[in-house]
Design a protein with these regions (language model features):
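Solvent-exposed, acidic/flexible segments
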Residues: 47-51, 81-89, 113, 182-186, ...
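Extracellular/periplasmic catalytic domains that process cell-envelope and extracellular macromolecules
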Residues: 29-33, 59-60, 102-103, 111, ...
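C-terminal catalytic-base region of ester-bond hydrolases, centering on the histidine
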Residues: 161, 199-280
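Short aromatic-enriched loop/helix-cap "lid" or pocket-rim segments at secondary-structure transitions
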Residues: 52, 147-154, 218-222, 244-245
Length: 280
C-alpha cells in the first residue's frame, strides 16, 4: 500500500508542478471553484498524510485546498486525531474560520476521511454558533457515523499515518486515544452525533462515500446518514469492479472523482473508472 501511495504522490506532485494554485496558500482564489476546501485527515494521520495526495489532485484541478493536523498531543505531532472529538472539533472549527477570514471567502467546503469524515458531520452540528453559516458542501469518505470496533480503529491509526505498530503502541500507552473511546460503537462521541436531532445542518449539502469492501468501518452501511437531501454513495455503484477498502479510499482516483463531483454539486457526473488497489 505504501508503494501505491508513493506512486500516486509522484504523479500528483508532477501535476501540481504544471498547474493550479498552491496548497495552503491563503492568497489562492479560484473563479471555477470559489469555495476553499478544508481537508480533514483520519485517525493517526496528519495533514501531510492520508488525504495529502487527494489534496494535490484537487489543487491541480483548480481548487484552493487547505489542511492542518488536528487532535495531536504535545510531544507526538506525527500522530493526529487522538484527542476527544470535542477538542479536535474546536481546533477544526477555528481553522475553518481562519481559512474563511484569510481567503475572504463567503463559504468553505469540507472533505474528510475516516475520523475526518466523522468530523465533517460533527463540526457543523456542534459548532453552528461559531460557524454561522460558513459551510457549504460537505464530503465524508467512510465516516464511522454509528461507530465501529476498537480493533478497526487501532488498524486505522497504524495504516493512515504510515505508523509502525510499536510507534502507535508507544503513543497510546503514553497519552491514550480518547478519540477511539468516542468512536467505538456506543461511544460518547457517537451517541452525541446520533442524539435524535438532525446531523445535516441548514445551508449545507452532505455527500457520504463508502466502499462495500471496507473491513475497518463495519458494517459498511454504518457510514450513511439517512436524512433528507443526503447523497449516500457506494463507490461500486459507479465503478462496480473497484475493490478498494477503508485505507485506500483516500488514494482511489475513482473516489477523487466522486469528491470533485460532490464539491461541484454534480454528484451523478460521469467519469472514467480506473483500477484501484484492494485492501482493508
Amino acid at each position: 500500500m505504501h508503494s501505491l501511495k508513493t506512486l500516486f504522490g509522484v504523479a500528483a506532485t508532477a501535476a501540481v508542478a504544471t498547474a493550479g494554485p498552491a496548497i495552503n496558500d491563503f492568497s489562492c482564489r479560484s473563479a471555477l471553484h470559489p469555495n476553499p476546501v478544508v481537508l480533514l485527515h483520519g485517525l493517526g494521520a496528519t495533514f501531510y498524510e492520508d488525504l495529502n495526495v487527494l489534496q494535490y489532485w484537487l489543487q491541480a484541478h483548480g481548487y484552493c485546498t487547505f489542511a492542518k493536523t488536528y487532535g495531536a498531543y504535545e510531544g507526538f505531532p506525527f500522530v493526529g486525531g487522538l484527542k476527544p472529538l470535542n477538542e479536535s472539533s474546536t481546533e477544526i472549527t477555528d481553522y475553518i474560520l481562519e481559512v474563511k477570514e484569510k481567503t475572504g471567502a463567503s463559504k468553505v467546503d469540507l472533505v474528510g476521511h475516516s475520523e475526518g469524515a466523522l468530523q465533517t458531520l460533527y463540526v457543523p452540528k456542534f459548532h453552528r454558533d461559531e460557524l454561522q453559516g460558513s459551510l457549504d458542501k460537505l464530503v465524508a469518505i467512510a465516516p464511522p457515523t454509528r461507530g465501529t470496533n476498537f480493533a478497526g480503529l487501532y488498524q486505522i491509526a497504524i495504516d493512515l499515518g504510515n505508523n509502525t505498530k510499536s510507534g502507535v503502541d508507544k503513543v497510546l500507552n503514553t497519552v491514550g486515544c480518547d478519540a477511539c473511546t468516542d468512536l467505538i460503537t456506543d461511544g460518547a462521541g457517537i451517541r452525541r452525533l446520533n442524539d435524535g436531532k438532525p446531523i445535516v445542518q441548514e445551508g449545507t449539502t452532505l455527500t457520504v462515500i463508502a466502499s462495500r469492501h471496507d473491513e475497518l468501518v463495519t458494517p459498511t452501511s454504518t457510514s450513511f446518514v439517512h436524512e433528507k437531501g443526503v447523497n449516500n454513495i457506494w463507490i461500486q455503484d459507479y465503478c462496480p469492479l473497484d475493490p478498494t477498502g477503508h485505507i485506500n479510499e483516500a488514494y482511489d482516483t475513482n473516489v477523487w472523482h466522486l469528491v470533485s463531483n460532490s464539491l461541484d454539486g454534480e454528484v451523478g457526473r460521469k467519469f472514467v473508472c480506473f483500477g484501484a488497489s484492494p485492501g482493508k
